């Protein structure tokens, strides 16, 4: 009886171990994203593409701002999310490196540093630059001859009526408004800014278009779709303040080893995404109010990535 019990226990223990290993093998890939329009779009692109290839996912899209999502990745609370090459300069502590001003060089540097330090893998980026920018209402820009941030600096110094809608992240991060103000020698007073909850440029652009609380300028991204339609003009950045922000999927090494097909699934998709394409897709969400998941699915089907 004792021998039987021991054997039974060994069989049971083996079964439990096998079940545990099986659960580990099939545990879903947890995909997060930031809360901005493009973050939601790209997060859903990743979810739908992996699901269509038979990889189970847990949708954590629209998780939070850059700090929240990055912290979740490093803590192992999510497995992957779409990030931007230019953010590597600030996440990895090498802001002065000129590599960040070039898409490929910035990508290779971020890929190397993040893997060495954190075992985070950067998959291939899109050929697009979603850099931070400042956009001004066209009527204001035309009336005051504003084409570049040098012109904005002159206008602000001359007490021109200027009020910027932006996210708290853009206002506070050293590579956001502080970088523009330092490079172009202007300083906005508190009453010249309107901080909007979240980080979505759809809200900041609309605030400028609708003159909300006197706003006539907005934090914007290089791949924002509705700028022209809503009558806003991006101010040129002749001093090249901003790094190149090319979107790329980031994934924990452990998760990629668990599902090595992820790289071959996502690489051709991200390579198909250029600036004009992202502008069009973002516009469907920001202007037409379409659901990011629907827009992502429509794009993937139109290119034959999913059925």
Locate the predicted segments by residue.
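An extracytoplasmic/periplasmic, membrane-proximal ligand-sensing/linker region
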Residues: 27, 38, 169-183, 260-307
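Ligand-binding "clamshell"
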Residues: 92-123, 187, 212-215, 225-239
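Extracytoplasmic "Venus flytrap"
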Residues: 28-46, 62-65, 169-172
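Short, polar/charged alpha-helical segment
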Residues: 37-56, 178, 182-184
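A conserved helix-loop-strand patch within extracytoplasmic ligand-binding domains
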Residues: 104-163, 271-275
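Beta->alpha turn/N-cap motifs
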Residues: 65-66, 76-89, 106-107, 167, ...
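Ligand-binding pocket segment of bilobal, Venus flytrap-like solute-binding proteins
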Residues: 158-237
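A bilobed periplasmic-binding-protein/Venus flytrap-type ligand-binding module shared by bacterial periplasmic
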Residues: 132-142, 245-259
């Amino acid at each position: 009886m004792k021998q039987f019990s021991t054997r039974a226990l060994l069989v049971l223990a083996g079964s439990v171990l096998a079940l545990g290993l099986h659960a580990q093998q099939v545990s879903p890939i947890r995909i997060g994203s930031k809360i901005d329009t493009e973050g939601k779009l790209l997060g859903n692109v990743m979810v739908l593409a992996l699901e269509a290839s038979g990889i189970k996912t847990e949708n954590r899209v629209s998780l939070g701002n850059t700090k929240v999502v990055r912290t979740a990745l490093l803590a192992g609370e999510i497995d992957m999310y779409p990030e931007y090459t230019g953010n590597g300069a600030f996440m990895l502590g090498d802001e002065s490196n000129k590599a960040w001003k070039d898409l490929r060089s910035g990508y290779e540097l971020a890929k190397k540093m993040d893997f060495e330090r954190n075992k985070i893998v950067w998959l291939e980026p899109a050929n697009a630059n979603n850099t931070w920018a400042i956009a001004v209402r066209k009527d204001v820009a035309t009336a005051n001859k504003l084409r570049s941030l040098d012109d904005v600096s002159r206008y602000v110094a001359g007490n021109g009526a200027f009020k910027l809608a932006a996210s708290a992240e853009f206002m506070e991060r050293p590579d956001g408004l502080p970088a523009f103000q330092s490079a172009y020698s202007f300083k906005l007073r508190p009453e010249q800014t309107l901080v909007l909850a979240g980080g979505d440029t759809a809200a900041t652009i609309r605030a400028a278009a609708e003159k909300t609380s006197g706003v006539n300028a907005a934090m914007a991204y290089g791949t924002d779709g509705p700028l022209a339609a809503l009558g806003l003009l991006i101010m040129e950045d002749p001093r090249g303040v901003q790094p190149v922000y090319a979107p790329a999927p980031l994934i924990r090494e452990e998760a990629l080893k668990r599902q090595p097909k992820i790289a071959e699934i996502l690489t051709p998709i991200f390579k198909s995404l250029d600036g004009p394409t992202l502008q069009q897709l973002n516009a469907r969400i920001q202007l037409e109010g379409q659901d990011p998941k629907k827009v992502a699915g429509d794009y993937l089907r139109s290119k034959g990535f999913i059925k």
